C-alpha cells in the first residue's frame, strides 16, 4: 500500500476549503472561487492549498497528449507506428515522428493549456494569500516562495517547448485582459530570477510532508536544469554552465540523496521511499482517477499482455523503442533488460502468448528489435516500454510515482556542465559513478574516460525503415555524453530537450524521419491561443 502524502489526500482539504462537492476527482474545475475573507486554514488546509498548484503537473506531464509525448514521440528513441489494430489516429504520431506537426495538433495544444492551468492555479493561491484572504502568519514567506518556485517550474516547460510565451504573474486581472508575449530570453531570465530569489526560503526537509513538493534541493535541481539549458533557453545570450555546477553541488553537498544501488528501485510501484528521487509526481490508481493518468503499460504492451500481468483493462499496443536506439546499448548494460520488454511473452501461469492480429496470427508473441516503418508494423515489432514496474492486477493507471528530478540527473547535469567547460576528466568520474550499478556483472565496462565523453555518438543516424536506408556518419560534439543521457533517462519525458541541447534534434535522420528544419526546435503556439490573444506572434516556421 502506498504511503499517502499531501498529493494523495489533497482533495479532501481543497474540497473543504473551497466548498466543492467532490473529494476524489482531481479535475481543476472549481478554483475560480475565492475563499471567504478572514479564513485561517490549518496546516492540513495549507497543504491542500498548495496541492491545487501541484495537481496540474500530473495532468500536464502524463495525461493523454501531454508533455511526455511532446518530449518523446518526436525523438530518436520512441515511435508509435501504424499497427494492425490502428494507431494511425489521423496521422498525429507520424507527424510527430517526422517533425511535421502544426499549430492545430493536440499535443502542442495540451502542453500549452495544461501548463498555463498550473500557472493560473499558482497565481490564484498567491492572490488569496497576498490579498489577506488567507492568513498564514509566520508561514507566509515560505509558502509564497514555494508557490513561486512551483509557478517557475511551469514556465521552465514553456521556455523549453514554446520559447516565446506570455509571463502572467497575477490572478486579479481585469476582464478581457490579454497578456503580452515575452521573448525566450526574457522567459529564461524570469524563471532564473524567481528561483534564485525564492529557493533560500524553501524547506530543507526531506520527508513525507514534503514528498512531491519543491523543497530547497528540488529547487536547486530545477535551477541547475535551467542553467544547463541556458544557451538554448536564452537564445544564446547566456552560457551558465558554471552556475549549473554550483547548483548541483548544493544538492550533492546536502547529503539528502543518493543513487539507488539497484536502479530499478527508482521505478517500482512503491517507489516513494527511494533516496534517489528529488521531486516526483505522485500517482495512485485509487486516488488519482483520471482515465489516462499514467498509462505507459496501456499504450505500449499488446492486448495479449493482459494475461501476463492480470491487468484489469486490456492494453492497446502502440509505442515502442526505435531499433537504432536499442542497438546503441552494450548488451551487458542492465538498463537494456530492465527498461525494455523483449522476446517471447507468457501469461502469469506460464502459457506462451499468441499473436491475434496482422500477419502473425497464431504465432508466439515475440517482441523483436525491428519495425517496418512508421506506416505499418506487425504487432510483435519493437521492444516495449518496461522501465516502470507493471504490478500484477493493476487498472489502466499505474501507481508508480513519476520522478521528474532525481539524483542521477543531478550528477549527470554536473558532468555535462563540466564537460562543456573543459573539465572532461572530472565529468567522466561522475558518469562512471552513475554507470557502475548497471554493469555489476562486468564492472570493467562501467568506467568511461574524459576523451570518450568528448567523442562522438555511437547512434547510427540515418533513415532506416523498409522504404529507404541512408547513413549519416557526421560527428556529434560530446556525442558520448548524449548517449549516456539516452541510456539513463529513457521513458522519463526528456529526450527532445537533450537532443536540442546537443544539436541533433533537427539535423539528423532516424527510422522514418529525415532531418528537419531548425524551426522545429520549438513547437508552434497553438492556433487556438493566437485566435484568442491577438498579441501572440507565431514562432518562426509555422
Give the label of every model feature segment:
Residues 22-25, 40-43, 54, 62, ...:
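Long, intrinsically disordered, low-complexity segments
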Residues 1-32:
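Bacterial Sec-dependent N-terminal signal peptides
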Residues 157-160, 166, 229-236, 422:
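Short coil/turn linking the two alpha-helices of tandem helical-hairpin repeats
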Residues 24-89, 188, 196-197, 201, ...:
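An aromatic- and glycine-enriched ligand-binding surface/loop that stacks and positions planar moieties
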Residues 43, 47-51, 55-60, 85-162, ...:
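Conserved, well-structured interaction surfaces
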Residues 93-99, 327-407:
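Flexible, polar/acidic helix-loop-strand segments at domain edges
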